[in-house]
Amino acid sequence: MSFDLEAIRSQFPGLALTDNGTRRIYFDNPAGTQVPVCVAAAMADCLMTKNANLGGYFASSLDADRVVQSARDGMADFLNAPASDEIIFGQNMTTITLHLSRSIGRLLRPGDEIVLSQMDHDANVWPWVLLARDLELEIRWLPFDKESFEFDLDVLDELITERTRLICVGSASNLTGTLNDIKAICARARAAGAMSFIDGVQSAPHIPVDVQDIGCDFFVCSSYKFFGPHQGILWGRSEVFEQLEPYKVRPSPAELPWCFETGTQSHEGLAGIAATVDYFALIGQSMAQAQLGNWDQFQGQRQQVHAAMELIFDYEMTLTSRLIEGLLDIDGITVQGITDKDAMGRRVPTVSFTHETAAPDKIAQALARQNIFVWSGHNYAVEVARTLGIDETGGAVRIGLVHYNSIAEIDELLTGLPAALAG
């Protein structure tokens, strides 16, 4: 059995909703995806039957312990983490990054340098800028080419010095959609004796993630971007965690992972995370038999999840090609990202565009009236919008595809877009 779109879509109740008889088309996915039935059911079950705090001797507390461990085990499989106790949960990626930045800051001294990217979401920019202000650190900016929408890693080599302590970059841009060569970037960080912090929020819904192969020290993502609940996830290398002093209250355990998790977590959210990983594993088991052999270094759920993500990305590249081809056929549109049909593997299916006369927010409003959901603006990619020169003209219209979207939905967008551009 190959990719079965009908079976996929049947798992998501939100896709069947209509407004005044018009079905909803969800292209707002980079800001948050719909969830399958299994995720909502797991969260409800946790609240109704496993609602207790951790560490007790009684049944509901033991059930809660198992929920949390299941989520850690699931995310370890999803990310190919060496150990589940390297998985840290939090409210969201932004909160986790702000929290961790304070612990990392204890290792830094005035004059130390952090390399940041002009392609990143502000959640992987401003926490580090604030840290630099507090500690008198130097920020060195890695630009991207405005024609190729990619980094020149020779420029990164020039930015790295003996004072470089940390390199922070996103795996994929939430505005241009570019997939960055984070493995090469992390190799450069290691060679310089610097830590690497990877924002994987925009790549995790689309491609297999293997933190061991990437070679990073930290990797963050958000499960609500990959069909789960509103939760943030951090993976960190245990030997690097051991160098950090966590910000925590006195009764909290001193050991990983608990020392970096403040207060009681959302157990229902963690139940949803475990169910999200189960969802991917089921796709791998039922639809990705052809891909399983590409991941025979793994076993069980870990193998199934990675095979599923490979299958998903292959399908999404078809969607992306169709969308970009259609956008380029419309007069006045500029796609702010890679458009070469032979380079779809170097981007995720997040496609942003501008128009020579129509404002992004007006386009988004007009599409919303057609029940087509997109975002407009800078979408928190502040440095990206500035670099592209679109920050003062309303940013861009962002169309975000995922594996439950269809060619038919893309064609409906392309059919309705000229009217939206005309106002």
Predicted regions mapped to residue ranges:
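Pyridoxal 5′-phosphate
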Residues: M1-G423
